[in-house]
Amino acid sequence: MAAITASMVAELRAKTDAPMMECKKALTEADGDMAKAEELLRVKLGNKASKAASRVTAEGVVASFVGANAGALVELNCETDFVAKNDDFNAFAKTVAELVATQNPADVAALSALPLDGKTVDEVRLALVGKIGENISIRRFVRFETSNKLATYLHGSRIGVIVEYTGAQEQVGKDVAMHVAAMKPVSLSADEVPADLIEKERRVAEQKAAESGKPAEIVAKMVDGSVQKFLKEVSLLNQPFVKNDKQTIEQMLKAADAAVQKFALFVVGEGIEKRQDDFAAEVAAQVAAAKQQ
């Protein structure tokens, strides 16, 4: 059997970006044949990626990029918070955000097919899955193309905001983006709040008002008042400015001779149901999997 040297392991790792121990195992199995070891490793990493594909990705990061006339937010998901802090994972997220801004893909499928480092984005993603050992998915992205100004704000990589605005002061854009991250409005103005949210709030208000025992006309006014209050609370322009609650965002913008055209807010894992396995079930699953090997 051929001797497996450290330089051989390093060479294979450079070619495949696989973990050191996996490289050594592949070289041992291939009896030192570099080409065969590379093939074995790619098959193994491919299998690893396939097994990971069914696992829930509710952790991750939001990455942003702003270019000359376009900016983007991307949510990249993984399975654990540990991987969300991985340098390679974060570098991939930033690269994907730049691709979205510069290449303008129609959707995640089109983004995944874009070329990247001699491969496609999806091939790079799968290689990262094999290297890290967790499922990784590009969940969503948003792209703003405009001749106006763009501002972004990231809060701990888990909350991301992009804002399109006009006005001379760049600090205004930064302040609005930070405010959106903190207060999480659902729309720019009250008349843009989704109808289903308004209807849901109205039903809740009707139930509460009905319990008051007041006359029908009073109940109707109470319901309308509750809905109007809700609309102000969830629309950006009507919210009290987080850095000065004596004025609304609309008043702050007017004072700065600025305006916001639109914004987008991403929160990592929002709407994704996390898998909840108890410890006993997890151990049982691992034992069952071991018996099948």
Swiss-Prot record:
Region of interest: Involved in Mg(2+) ion dislocation from EF-Tu: 80-83
Transmembrane segments: none
Covalent S-S links between cysteines: none
Name of the protein in question: Elongation factor Ts
Alphabetical UniProt keywords: Cytoplasm, Elongation factor, Protein biosynthesis
HAMAP family found in the cross-reference section: EF_Ts
Subcellular location: Cytoplasm
Family: Belongs to the EF-Ts family.
Molecular-function GO term, any one: translation elongation factor activity
Organism listed in the record: Burkholderia mallei (strain ATCC 23344)
Function: Associates with the EF-Tu.GDP complex and induces the exchange of GDP to GTP. It remains bound to the aminoacyl-tRNA.EF-Tu.GTP complex up to the GTP hydrolysis stage on the ribosome.
Coarse class of the protein's main subcellular location: cytoplasm
One Pfam family per UniProt: EF_TS
Keyword Protein biosynthesis: yes
